[in-house]
Amino acid sequence: MAAAIALLDEEGVDGLNMRDLGQRLGAAATAVYWHVSSKDNVIALATDAVWAEIAVPPAPRPGMWRPSAEAFARSAYDMVCRHPWLWPAISASFAYGVGMARHQEQTYAIFQAAGFEGRELDGAVNTYSVFIFSASQGVAAAFALRARLKRSGEDAQHLMAELNQRAEAVATAFPALRERMAAHSHAPLSDDDRFAFGLDVVLDGLEARLRKSRALARKTEPTAGQ
């Protein structure tokens, strides 16, 4: 499976073929089919395997769930950035296996330890997970474009320069956008910086939500003697 993952990392889902995989393994494509029935099966197996790369943090101590959530989010984000073909593969094949399920179980454990329950727990896990994997979409889009240009033989650097020029031309009609694009051209914000900022905002919001839920629960508790 390591050879398939490495090939996907280089070529993406559309660039994967059994002949190239066989060459990496030192075998004919027909021999590969003895082990996996199809390209879709290879993608499904590779998709499930990469989830194991996410480092599982220790069980959070009472009141200390946030460091676990931060470490788990960072490891998940890094994994998806290493394998930017993952989400296109999931979307194309509806792949859902033990690896992804285990990741979801571990995410629930972190937010259960924080004190979320019921629908609040579901909402916290969903908000956290959607942010992590949405944050990687820029990396995935850039990878898909590079892979497509590589297959077509186009000059990626020249095309990106043209796209940036077009974006700047469009932005001139929008003052706030024009100002921020100019600022970013001098001091660009890295993908990691954007991720760290967004994760802080999400976890700040979830902490505030948890405090609000607890305060509401205290208000609705029956008083002594009732």
Tell me the role of every PLM-derived stretch.
Residues 46, 50, 54, 132-136, ...:
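Hydrophobic recognition helices of helix-based DNA-binding modules
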Residues 3, 7-41, 45:
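Helix-turn-helix
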Residues 47, 77-99, 105-106, 137-145, ...:
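Amphipathic alpha-helical segments used for helix-helix packing
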Residues 2-6, 10-11, 41-57, 67-75, ...:
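Alpha-helical structural segments
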Residues 141-226:
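C-terminal peripheral helix-coil segments that are non-catalytic and often amphipathic
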Residues 56-102, 118-128:
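Hydrophobic alpha-helical connector segments
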Residues 106-164:
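A contiguous pocket-lining binding segment that forms or flanks enzyme active sites
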